[in-house]
Swiss-Prot record:
Protein name listed in UniProt: ATP-grasp enzyme ankG
Catalytic activity line of the entry: NK13650 D + L-aspartate + ATP = NK13650 C + AMP + diphosphate + H(+); NK13650 B + L-aspartate + ATP = NK13650 A + AMP + diphosphate + H(+)
Segments crossing the lipid bilayer: none
Gene: ankG
Region described as Disordered: 1-30
Molecular function via GO: ATP binding; ligase activity
Pathway(s): Secondary metabolite biosynthesis
Free-text function comment from the UniProt entry: ATP-grasp enzyme; part of the ank cluster that mediates the biosynthesis of NK13650 C, a highly modified cyclo-arginine-tyrosine dipeptide. AnkG catalyzes the last step of the pathway via amidation NK13650 D with L-Asp to produce NK13650 C. AnkG also amidates NK13650 B into NK13650 A. Within the pathway, the cyclodipeptide synthase ankA acts as the scaffold-generating enzyme and is responsible for formation of the cyclo-Arg-Tyr diketopiperazine (cRY) from L-Arg and L-Tyr.
Keywords for the protein's UniProt record, in alphabetical order: ATP-binding, Ligase, Nucleotide-binding
SUPFAM superfamilies for the chain: Glutathione synthetase ATP-binding domain-like (SSF56059)
Lineage: Eukaryota, Fungi, Dikarya, Ascomycota, Pezizomycotina
Amino acid sequence: MYQISLKATKSAAEPTSSTDASHDDRQVERDSYDTAMLRFISDMELSSMYAEKTSPYPILMPRSFLEDLKNFQDLLFVAVSNILDRWWEDREADFPRRMPLEPHEESVLKHYNERPLHWRPDMLLPAAGDPNTNLPFKICEINARSPFNSMIKSICMFQAAAASKTALPDGLELASTADSLVDSLVSLFNPDLPLHVIWHEGITDPIDAFSSFYKKRTGKIPRVIRATDLRLAPDSSSPTGRILCCVASAASADHSNGQAIVSETGEPLERIYQVGLQMSHRDYSELSSEVLQQLAVDGICDLRNIFLVSDKRMLGVIWQELDSLVHKHHVLTAEQAEILRQGIVHTILPGSEDMERLLRQTREGSVSKDSYLLKPARGHRGMGILLGKDLGQEEFEGLLEELADPLLPADRRYVVQPFIEQALFGLRLYDDSEPQQCQMTGTYHAIGGCFAGLGVWRADSERICSRFHGAFSIPAIVPR
């Protein structure tokens, strides 16, 4: 796996690396890519942020990598689905004790409505030398809060690569296509029903971009609302006796059973039939339990994915359950469980025996703090990660002592993972810059449990590789 220059490559059999390409070839390739990207952004009325910090020189990767990801995702979906189905009923497994949730989350998850879902697992590329695995990647977390931001970045970059005047050499093709990613994203929703996107804080660029794609595919324009606009209205035809609505202007007020919908204070309301969600965990905590319950029933997103799957502790639960999934529940074979074990970073849960063992071994000196990191259970964008090598010995041990308690407040709740030494790649990120030794973090998208496409690679010379910490994004290509 390495970065190549399409302009300098004359044959798929003899690709030319970006580090060996001439300045002139690289400049032509960069100009063609930038022109295609800016044209696409302009045509779709997207933010220029999607053109920032991108490298046009793609990563050439083996097709077998994609096949491994597809197979892995199939098994991951089987494992997670079985765990979610047993979450409340399996008293022996006692998942709520192993992974405690906030009270408002526990109450609403008992009223969920299973819907299509979006997952975006992140993967690391370990340095060569592990004889115990045949997989080239390790999944370090699953992101499932919102499909919009990262998927749209991938759509823009693969579209620019496809539309660039620098043609792909015969025998090579893009690892994903913009059209297939857009189709997958739009498939989360029913185009025959109105769509509302609930947004609370932060930039609206991802939602604006999604709205453009959705309009082009369906001819419909989603209505973007804030969480504070949500209301409930009585409706005898609903299983809960209520329907989810939002504040509307008098001209657009909706009707239910032939009657205008108004709130108790006389506000004209508009019924919500399906929603896309761009909200943080704090946003959900600020909703009333009744509104949250109705979101669970009416929402297009199964809230178990937000409160359970997207929590970093879920990987630890999966790891703990692998033997049970084989020998007790019979949903995986031993070989399939081993694929998941090899492909998931070992994640240690607060309050677990593994956490107690790690603390004991650290005190004994048999393991080093430098070999571990702590990751906020509800963190995102690479923020809040603590590397053991950056902590003092007493500080590290003190954190592990705290993590003996699974009921820690949310802002003190971490998982512990081994620090994975990642492979380094010689990459050109900036124009006219010397190649840098960088690590790469990958991602892929899954819709409805099925692999939907590879995302773009993130590359940086820093230890935490995140686009929000300054990492560059790079598309990928594979042999036909």
